Amino acid sequence: MLSKTRILNLFLGILIALSLELFSGTTTFAQNIETIKISGTAAGISTRYIGAVEGNINFDIKDLQDLGINTYRIYGGMSRWEAEDDDGKYGWPSIDEIKTNPNIINWAHWDRIMTDPPQGSDYWWSGQPGTVWQGNARTIFNTLKQANIRPVVSIRNVDSGWKPSWALQLNPPRTGEDWNEWWEHVFATVYWLNVRNDYRVDDWEIHNEPDNRDQGWGGTRADYFELVKVAKDAIDFVYKTYLPDRTYRIHGPKTVGGSNWPEAALQEIPNYFDTVNVHNYDADISNYTRKVRGWMNGTVRANSQLWVGEWGTYEISYGDLSLALNLIKNVIRGSQPGDNYIDGSHIFCLYDWGKLGLAEGLVGEGGKRRAGYYALRMGIRALQGGKATFFPITNSSDLMAVATIDASKNVYLLVVNDRATSYTVNADISELIKTGNGTVREFSSQRMDEVVGNLRLKGGNASFALAGNSAILIKFDRQN
């Protein structure tokens, strides 16, 4: 039998052990507390347009609307809409003849290719039958118009597959006949979409990554600048002659990430485009964004919009959680003020491209939505549309956060944790809102932008758990 002394000592030992365990746990927990105090001074506004580049396996407006995008980028050009010379006579009609009488163009060809494309698909040029979406260009553009989603169309003579073969002779254009064909194609595209029809397509890109030979441009930088000048003349003629009350935008120079072509374009042809548009696949897009902004400063494009026409990935699956979280961080970076700011963007790409070896999109075969889709959707909820932005007074080294206010004065708080460590976050948004109920959404390996609970503000403060490798979005409804 144990003596009373031994029993007492054993009991005390157990108490000490329990106390140490509890203390240890509490100490560890305390180390994982982060306090975020949001400034009451607006830093600026969030990115106005967040959209996606098309993919060829599908086009379903329900995906675009559920994702919340308000712009959609489309690869136009000769391979898609003029795979054969539309009139069969190279170099005819001339630019002056078209300006005098636009009906000299073979509009029967354009009506047919836009309405009854080969193999029943506007993507016939990019994939095998049975692997691409079934539908025509009319459906795409009319659907975007009805949904108030802003299309941005790239016009190319030759695509990344160096097609169509007949257009190789004007890649780059050299002769008068070459320039006639290029001018006619640009004119016909813009005229068909906006004059012959009314699809409200007012954003135009001239080629795609002209500094990347794999994308089909066969000329030099100087040749590309001439291509832009002639395209500008064709586009400008359509609007001044037939759409005098409409504003159009030419995006340029549409170059690869890290390229120095934008600097040259801003010096040599700044009056032939009005929206600076570059590609940027960096993990942190802000570094190159700042460089391009620096080039814009001191030119006539200093106050012009800056768009990122492609970002995200074409190498890694959008099912990757780390990549998905970084999408949210880059959306936040694009809404930061000053030289980090991005006016509009298109992630590459919404849908898979059906050709073997090409990129995965946010949405795969059978409508499967990947993690990146839900991550971007969360970022769009908080940031798209030019909302007033507010950032932490002191930035956390571990978390990235931003708050926004929408037109109804509701407040959004978005916090991203791309580390394995979990946190308790004490958020102070008292400078923006004092009381209100918050709906909490979580993005993580377990929750894909799903509602997980509610919070009530107390004096503008709220606490919540933030799991490792996750993001939280809280929408606080303004009480009347």
Predicted stretch roles:
Residues 1-14:
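Bacterial N-terminal signal peptides that target proteins for export
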Residues 11-24:
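Bacterial N-terminal signal peptides
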Residues 17, 28-59:
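Mature N-terminal, pre-catalytic/accessory segment of carbohydrate-active enzymes
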Residues 70-284:
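Substrate-binding cleft and catalytic face of glycoside hydrolase catalytic domains
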Residues 275, 280-355, 365-381, 418-420, ...:
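Catalytic-core region of carbohydrate-active enzymes that cleave or remodel glycosidic bonds
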Residues 395-436, 469-473:
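Carbohydrate-binding surface patches
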Residues 430-448:
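Solvent-exposed beta-hairpin/edge-strand motifs
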Residues 455-480:
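C-terminal beta-strand-rich structural cap/linker in extracellular carbohydrate-active enzymes
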